[in-house]
């Protein structure tokens, strides 16, 4: 992932895709799907407030905009044990986005998709170790505990946006997709986890 995040665009750096895509998803949910929403899904007015809060809160974190996979769940990671190589597949959602979103989204995916279990979300110490290796691989030099802690805070805050993004996406899929999957249930799970961890994650402070 660190190597992918070092891919640069020619010329000026593109704007992150996160807010544009989430706004489009929300608009679709509001205008075309709202009447059919389940009682377990937050009201559209609540979703609109949360989207505004996310943009205001996360935009202040100064997470770098890098080339991201944006959908790095386990099935999109191929490991060649004979060569010790890892490669990623399925770049359908790839694009320039916040570094912390890509990592936070990857951590969220530890919980799985078909049988979601957020007990599998990596613990703080596991994350710190992962982020330490990530920064070292990206920079090629030693990193400080403060740098690791800073990325940890950014990642866990952007993990909130990951929940919100895929919950909106799932509502749309529930309306239009022909895939045999309970997208509505998945949307409810992601929204529930968002609200469950929001207060705790919001309280995280950047290191001085």
Language model: regions and residue ranges:
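Regulatory N- and C-terminal appendages and interdomain linkers associated
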Residues: 173, 177-208
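All-alpha amphipathic helical-bundle segments outside canonical DNA-binding/catalytic cores
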Residues: 143-159
